[in-house]
């Protein structure tokens, strides 16, 4: 009898947890300002790099359909001096100090970038200067990739679509507009270019998500070829011609997992976020941890 009561209680608790739905719609009003500090640690190619930054989100406009949220990052700091850190510095300097004007719906979900043409022009200008510095400081990079190929890599990650996908993957605005229940799932593309399936668990104002790779064999082949074309264009044709054999060998296998935890404040804005990501693409392992804290 006691066992039956216990089982009934556990079943009821499970149903209550599953029935809980968290609608993420932060308080938005013209003039609202939120500031955050972010610390990101990246381990790759035998290196360990930590990047810190501050970011400010300001609701600058109220529109018929939603809002405009300005986001600007500053005070970037990188603690290491190696190839990975140089590339991270280049990536951060591409966006540091640039004001991104996100057009959102009523719930704060990002739909487009109002000043994208201006943002793109500034990033392209910075890319030229940064690439010159990279080729000067790391001439070995120039032996593999030309200046044009490097710029193509930098700018490929800065299309409006790519930037919005990045925002919706992880970060302060990632959950906005979602009605999340335990067991719910969605899909996104992570920073490594892998399609991921994400599962959610809700507990009050806390949301945990666990993500795994969700790619077909054809998706995997396409991603691998694109990456080879970016980092080793001279070998791209060889990889294309032998892609099936290479995939079967496991040399080009791509794996990845991500786990994120969000805690929302009473106003619906993110209070804290932590993210752990591990990936292995073409035998190269990368581990990333990130913490974002509201100030």
Regions found by a protein language model. Give the residues of each.
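Mixed-charge, low-complexity intrinsically disordered regions
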Residues: 105-106, 115
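Bacterial Sec-dependent N-terminal signal peptides
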Residues: 1-24
């Amino acid at each position: 009898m006691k066992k039956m009561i216990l089982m009934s209680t556990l079943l009821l608790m499970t149903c209550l947890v599953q029935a809980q739905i968290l609608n993420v719609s932060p308080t938005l009003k013209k003039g609202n300002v939120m500031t955050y500090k972010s610390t990101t640690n990246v381990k790759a190619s035998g290196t360990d790099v930590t990047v810190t930054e501050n970011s400010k989100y300001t609701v600058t406009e109220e529109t018929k359909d939603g809002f405009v949220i300005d986001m600007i990052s500053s005070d970037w700091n990188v603690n290491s001096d190696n190839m990975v850190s140089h590339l991270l510095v280049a990536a951060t300097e591409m966006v540091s100090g640039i004001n991104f004007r996100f057009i959102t719906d009523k719930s704060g979900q990002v739909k487009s970038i109002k000043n994208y043409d201006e943002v793109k022009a500034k990033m392209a200008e910075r890319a030229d200067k940064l690439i010159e510095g990279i080729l000067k400081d790391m001439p070995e990079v120039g032996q593999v990739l030309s200046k044009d190929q490097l710029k193509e890599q930098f700018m490929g990650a800065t299309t409006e679509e790519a930037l919005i996908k990045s925002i919706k993957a992880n970060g302060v605005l990632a959950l906005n507009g979602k009605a999340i229940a335990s067991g719910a799932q969605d899909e996104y593309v992570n920073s490594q270019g892998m399609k991921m399936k994400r599962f959610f668990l809700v507990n009050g104002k806390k949301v945990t998500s666990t993500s795994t790779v969700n790619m077909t064999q054809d998706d995997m082949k396409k991603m691998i070829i694109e990456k080879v074309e970016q980092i080793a264009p001279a070998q791209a044709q060889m990889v294309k011609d032998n892609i099936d054999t290479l995939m079967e060998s496991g040399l080009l296998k791509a794996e990845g997992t991500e786990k994120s935890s969000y805690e929302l404040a009473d106003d619906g804005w993110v209070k804290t976020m932590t993210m752990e990501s591990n990936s292995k693409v073409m035998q190269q392992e990368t581990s990333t941890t990130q913490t974002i804290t509201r100030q």
